[in-house]
């Protein structure tokens, strides 16, 4: 199994995340895509990886520029590297630099199926703040036409997992489109799921990372049910009163991942997580995660001194069956 991981932040944080994968997902080989925008020299990253004795990683020599909403090209670069070096029968898991695993068993869970993603229909009138820019994206419209008028489908990127052969096919389709021009939404959360759905790929489950974003959206949608009739222009994400309300709620921090949430997922506390399994975007419902199918969290601050990061590191240390330095690099037979 492979993990595609685009990074751009501090080398010491990157190395710590690699140790997290080694502890909780030792079957995976992590393919790092280092952004061309990264503000550190490569020798500094290599030194940090060497110091932490990370043997579960390959650094992709291809470096594309990345920015918010422009991470798709980084994952596709990693898919291309895997295509040149690995078997088409492998699985490729997609992650971000601010998620972390909190319990073991990911590989065993993924071996039960083929592709793990959300099925989030994106239609006009959706509460999702990025629905409108996604539906108006000329590149996505072109891709959907080439796929026979495919509907637009979204999925959380973190913790999603696809058969390598499927991602190779999707990468070929996307190569004909312009993904360099900013589009005002995270393309990686829409293009892959849309193409996979259009190609008829079997869905075996949902992503295995629990994101604080879904906690925020659930509460924000409920507030909008009462506020939209008062402020007018319901469903228009850029309407100033709506944006101001959203900003105030974000700043409150009510949705942040805490140790309590980490413990719930680490214990697989299904009853305490059940109410978050399904979410409505206002005009459709979709499944966020599967019971017993959560193994990590997002967002974890990209700071090595973050108390939450330190707490998860202690969980990883307690989980490890031996000294971290003895963890071996996965071979292609494991992948």
Feature locations, PLM:
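ER/Golgi luminal nucleotide-sugar-dependent glycosyltransferases, focusing on the catalytic module
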Residues: 1-335
């Amino acid at each position: 199994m492979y993990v595609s991981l685009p990074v751009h932040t501090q080398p010491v944080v990157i190395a710590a995340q690699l140790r997290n994968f080694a502890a909780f997902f030792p079957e995976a080989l992590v393919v790092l895509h280092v952004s061309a925008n990264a503000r550190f020299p490569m020798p500094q990253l290599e030194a940090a990886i060497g110091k932490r004795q990370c043997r579960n990683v390959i650094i992709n020599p291809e470096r594309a520029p990345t920015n918010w909403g422009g991470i798709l090209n980084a994952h596709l670069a990693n898919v291309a590297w895997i295509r040149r070096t690995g078997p088409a029968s492998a699985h490729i898991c997609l992650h971000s630099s601010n998620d972390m695993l909190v319990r073991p068993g990911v590989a065993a869970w993924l071996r039960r199926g083929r592709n793990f993603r959300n099925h989030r229909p994106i239609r006009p009138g959706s509460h999702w703040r990025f629905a409108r820019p996604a539906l108006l994206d000329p590149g996505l419209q072109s891709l959907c036409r080439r796929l026979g008028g495919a509907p637009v489908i979204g999925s959380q990127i973190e913790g999603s997992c696809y058969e390598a052969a499927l991602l190779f096919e999707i990468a070929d389709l996307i190569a004909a489109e312009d993904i360099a021009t900013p589009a005002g939404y995270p393309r990686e959360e829409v293009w892959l799921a849309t193409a996979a759905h259009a190609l008829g790929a079997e869905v075996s489950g949902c992503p295995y990372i629990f994101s604080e974003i879904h906690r925020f959206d659930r509460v924000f949608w409920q507030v909008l049910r009462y506020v939209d009739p008062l402020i007018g222009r319901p469903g228009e994400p850029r309407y100033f009163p709506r944006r101001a309300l959203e900003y105030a709620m974000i700043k409150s921090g009510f949705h942040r991942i805490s140790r309590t949430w980490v413990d719930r997922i680490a214990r697989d506390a299904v009853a305490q997580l059940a109410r978050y399994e399904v979410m409505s975007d206002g005009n459709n419902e979709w499944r966020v995660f599967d019971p017993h199918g959560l193994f990590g969290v997002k967002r974890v601050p990209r700071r090595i001194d973050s108390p939450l990061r330190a707490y998860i590191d202690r969980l990883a240390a307690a989980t490890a069956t031996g000294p971290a330095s003895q963890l071996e690099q996965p071979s292609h037979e494991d992948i």
